[in-house]
Design a protein with these regions (language model features):
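PLP-dependent amino-acid enzyme catalytic core
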Residues: 1-468
């Protein structure tokens, strides 16, 4: 399996290259040169697989010779041994919608499913090479905690996590900042999540800096995270009783990585009818799907902070597909975004996008009302992001018996207590291990959103860590 950049199809790379570099040197994102296909018979043969077995089948067609079969199985087994539910992913039926519980990992978010695998892949490769690596990531709340849990105490790794100051929930922040391992650095940036993402991308684009600190990343742009997320689309399809029905899946969407994994699953042969882009009032993607105009604007804070995003970092991958893999067109669109702060899809490109996706935004009032209604009718508490996915699916039209409906639950409700109290007038249930973080010491530094200041801080910490 080989990969190329969305901005240059001439150079190809191995999975190991793609995994360790995360972002292509030309600023593009890595994608496979071809998508592996599973026949309907192959898919049905996996019906009784455990999540770990299915994860191996999916990863095995993407990793090439980066890991031996025994190594890959060991990585997957170790990764999911830390989950609180032995099924890893569970389903709950509400109003004929299968709600997909993706929050049974150590930091209570869907990010754990991919991040634990990434952490163990890094450990495997770096233990063999003895090379040191510095991972830098931006988080709107959940990625950071998942990355820190997966990478803490790893021998050849440092992890630097940027989060927007005062724009993540206290639970989200404490899941990051109470981890005191010496290879973990939490940085609160004065600004928005988009500012954090911009800083990370600029560091990636600075080849001299990137090479000097051996930089890599675990944000959703890392292809391995996409592969790990493909797995649960296959898993939930095969957990339903009537597998002859095509799927409609609603995905709470911020950076477009989770829903893009669904798109790849469809290209691999999974019978997905539509993928629903569910967003809050920061509805850039809904507008783009309607008009073809991609025009980021100011981020407006919401009760669903992980979706308070205006620049979806994985959207370039779907651009590459809807432009029929014309890298020159992708470069032109991304240059327009950089220079004019927007781009316009043509009719063919917009039609290609609409062929696979629907989009619905959900207001703050609708989000809280959905949490309230589901709790009153089913005694189950949705987190705000999952509530947006649930409501977006309802907005897509009346549910037909011809399809199977799924809503991805991306986080545990206890991570967003203020929103839950606003909706149902009571605190969400909280696992015991989460209660303990509120009495633990925190460690983080606050920095201005200045690239040079940030780079200087990271270089100093890398130097101190190397000498110590």
């Amino acid at each position: 399996m080989l990969y190329f950049s969305t901005r240059d199809k001439q150079r190809t790379f191995s999975f190991k290259d793609v995994f360790l570099n995360a972002l292509a040197s030309d600023g593009g994102l890595y994608v496979p040169t071809s998508i592996p296909k599973f026949s309907p018979e192959k898919i049905q043969s996996m019906k009784n697989y455990t999540f770990q077995e299915m994860s191996y089948e999916i990863f095995n067609v993407f990793v090439g010779d980066a890991f031996s079969p025994e190594e890959l199985k060991g990585i997957i087994s170790k990764s999911y041994s830390v989950f609180r539910n032995e099924k890893i992913v569970d389903l709950k039926l509400i109003d004929n919608i299968s709600c997909v519980e993706l929050f049974h990992g150590p930091t209570l978010a869907f990010k754990d499913i991919a991040m634990q695998v990434l952490g163990n892949m890094y450990e495997n490769l770096l233990n063999k090479s003895k090379n040191k690596m510095n991972l830098i990531t931006a988080t709107s709340g959940d990625t950071g905690a998942a990355a820190i849990d997966a990478l803490k105490s790893k021998k050849y790794l440092n992890i630097f996590v940027l989060h927007p100051e005062n724009k993540v929930s206290e639970t989200q922040r404490r899941l990051m900042t109470t981890v005191l391992d010496k290879n973990v650095y939490n940085i609160a940036i004065k600004g928005t999540f988009d500012d954090c993402q911009y800083l990370v991308k600029e560091m990636f684009n600075d080849q001299k800096f990137r090479n000097s600190i051996q930089m890599s990343g675990v944000n959703s742009i890392n292809w391995a995270r996409i592969v790990a997320q493909i797995v649960y689309y296959f898993f939930i399809y095969l957990r339903q009783k009537e597998t002859e029905k095509r799927m409609i899946v609603s995905v709470p969407t911020g950076n477009f990585g989770d829903i893009y994994a669904g798109y790849i699953a469809k290209q691999m042969g999974l019978p997905i009818e539509k993928l629903i882009i569910a967003s809050n009032h920061n509805n850039l993607l809904e507008k783009c799907l309607s008009t073809g105009l991609y025009q980021p604007s100011k981020v407006n804070p919401s009760v669903s902070p992980s979706m308070d995003i205006q620049v979806a970092s994985n959207f370039e991958r779907i651009l590459f597909e809807i432009c029929n893999q014309d890298e020159s067109r992708v470069v032109a669109l991304m240059n327009n975004l950089k220079n004019k702060k927007e781009f316009q899809l043509n009719k063919t490109e917009l039609s290609n996008l609409q062929e696979n996706f629907l989009a619905h935004s959900v207001s703050e009032e609708e989000t809280l009302q959905t949490i309230k209604e589901v709790y009153q009718e089913h005694n189950f508490v949705l987190d705000p992001h999952s509530a947006i996915g649930f409501k977006a699916l309802k907005k897509s039209g009346s549910l037909s018996d011809n399809f199977s409906y799924f809503c991805l639950e991306t986080a545990h409700a206890c991570k967003f207590p203020d929103a839950i109290v606003s909706a149902i007038d009571k605190e969400p249930p909280m696992p015991d291990f989460v209660k303990k973080i509120f009495s633990k010491e925190e460690s983080f530094i606050v920095l201005d959103g200045n690239l040079e200041i940030l780079k200087s801080y990271i270089e100093k910490k890398v130097s101190n860590n190397s000498s110590g």
